[in-house]
C-alpha cells in the first residue's frame, strides 16, 4: 500500500518542478544572486621615518606581515583570491611596499599581480577591479570568488568611494598606525555593491590615536580628492 503524500509536501514539490520547467534551471539556482568580494588591505609596515622622506620597501615587520597573509590564504582562513592588485612600482611615487605585501600570497596562488595602476590612478583601479569582480561572479556559479587590492592607506577612502560607498565610515581616514584592518565589498554580477563588515589580518598593528591621521590630512593639499574625514 502506498502512503499518502502530505498536501504541503506535494504542493512544494509541484511548485519546484513548475519553476524548474519554466526557467530551464534547477529551482535552487534561482535563489542565487552571483557575486564576488573585493578585499582591500594596506601595505605592510615600513621603517620609522621622522624625516618624512620616501620609503620604498617593507621593514622586517612588514615582510613578516606579508608572510602571514600567505599563511591566511594557504590555510583556508582567507579566500583563494582569483585576482590581486597592487600599486605599480614603476609609476610615481615608485614605492614597492604594496607589491611586496602581496607577493608571497600571489606566488602561493600562482597568479600574477596586476600592477597596471599607479598610486594616483585610484579611480581607474576601482573601475577595473569592479569589472574583474563582476566577470568572476558571473562565471563562478555563486561560489563568491574574491579579489584582493593592496593600496596606500591615505588613498583607501578614495578607493572606497570609487567602489560606491560614501557613508561616514567609508569617508573616514585610515589611521597612520593601522596596518591590520581589512575592508570588504560584495559586488553583484547584475549590478550593485554591498559594504560588508570590516575584518582584520589578526597580525597586530591596528592601533590608532587621535593624532594618527596627520599624514593623510596633510596629503589633501598635495592631491585633490583625498578628502578623508578624521574620526574625532
Where would I find each of the regions flagged by the language model?
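Compositionally biased, intrinsically disordered/low-complexity regions enriched for serine, proline
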Residues: 3, 23, 194-195
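N-terminal signal peptide
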Residues: 13-29
Amino acid at each position: 500500500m502506498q502512503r499518502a503524500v502530505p498536501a504541503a509536501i506535494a504542493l512544494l514539490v509541484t511548485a519546484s518542478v513548475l519553476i524548474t520547467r519554466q526557467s530551464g534551471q534547477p529551482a535552487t539556482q534561482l535563489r542565487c544572486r552571483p557575486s564576488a568580494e573585493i578585499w582591500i588591505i594596506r601595505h605592510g609596515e615600513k621603517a620609522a621615518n621622522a624625516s618624512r622622506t620616501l620609503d620604498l620597501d617593507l621593514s622586517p615587520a612588514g615582510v613578516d606581515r606579508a608572510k602571514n597573509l600567505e599563511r591566511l590564504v594557504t590555510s583556508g582562513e582567507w579566500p583563494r583570491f582569483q585576482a590581486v592588485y597592487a600599486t605599480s612600482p614603476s609609476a610615481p611615487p615608485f614605492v614597492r611596499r604594496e607589491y611586496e605585501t602581496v607577493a608571497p600570497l600571489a606566488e602561493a596562488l600562482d597568479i600574477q599581480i596586476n600592477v597596471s595602476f599607479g598610486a594616483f590612478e585610484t579611480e581607474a583601479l576601482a573601475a577595473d577591479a569592479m569589472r574583474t569582480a563582476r566577470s568572476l561572479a558571473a562565471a563562478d556559479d555563486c561560489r563568491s570568488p574574491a579579489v584582493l587590492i593592496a593600496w596606500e592607506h591615505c588613498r583607501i577612502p578614495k578607493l572606497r568611494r570609487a567602489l560606491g560607498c560614501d557613508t561616514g565610515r567609508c569617508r573616514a581616514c585610515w589611521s597612520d598606525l593601522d596596518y591590520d584592518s581589512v575592508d570588504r565589498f560584495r559586488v553583484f554580477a547584475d549590478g550593485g555593491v554591498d559594504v560588508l563588515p570590516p575584518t582584520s589580518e589578526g597580525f597586530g598593528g591596528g592601533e590608532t590615536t587621535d593624532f594618527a591621521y596627520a599624514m593623510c590630512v596633510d596629503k589633501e593639499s598635495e592631491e585633490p580628492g583625498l578628502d578623508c574625514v578624521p574620526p574625532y
